[in-house]
Every structure is written in C-alpha cells, then in structure tokens.
A protein has these predicted regions:
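The feature represents the first ordered module of a protein
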Residues: 1-62
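Residues at secondary-structure transition points
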Residues: 64-66
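Short, compact, well-ordered microdomains
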Residues: 68-95
Length: 95
C-alpha cells in the first residue's frame, strides 16, 4: 500500500497568505514517528513560512513558528489541526 492522502485543505486568505494542511496515511510509521501518518501543515506566503507542522523523515514530529523549530507531541490528527490553527491565529494576532 502506498501513502494515501487522507485530508487536504487549502485556503488563500484576504491578505494573500496561504493556509494549507495535508495528512497522508502510511502503510507503516515513518522513521522518527510512532504513528502511521505523514503530515505537512503550512501557513505563510510562497517562499516564507510563518507556521509549519510536519514530521519530515528522520526528524519526527515538530513544528516551526517564525524561525524557531521545536518538537511537537503528536496525539491525534484532530489535535494536530487544532494546535496548528491556534498557532496560525496567534501569528496573525487574532488570539
């Protein structure tokens, strides 16, 4: 079984910034992760990430906020999306 795209949502906001979320189901867990999901969540402009969550092979679950990278404690896809959108709102000064 190859990776299957389980969720994809992309929005271009009024200021031209992009919020894009992709989650794939994998046949087995990726190196560095304890779950069978691969994900890439992005907020920013082309070429300029302000907030990002991903689990790049070998790095495991982590997030980027501005220029800071830190480990992320993945629990569920729903919580992942909730945490990401909360960081997006904070980055936009909305909360």
């Amino acid at each position: 079984m190859k990776a299957r795209l389980a969720f994809h949502d992309k929005q271009v906001l009024a200021d031209g910034s992009i919020v894009e979320m992709k989650i794939w189901e994998l046949p087995e867990s990726a190196r560095g992760s304890k779950h069978r999901l691969k994900y890439s969540l992005f907020y920013g402009w082309p070429g300029r990430r302000l907030v990002g969550y991903d689990n790049e092979r070998g790095k495991g679950d982590h997030r980027h906020v501005q220029d800071k990278e830190e480990a992320y404690a993945f629990s569920t896809p729903e919580q992942l999306i909730e945490d990401f959108l909360a960081d997006v709102r904070r980055s936009r000064g909305e909360s």
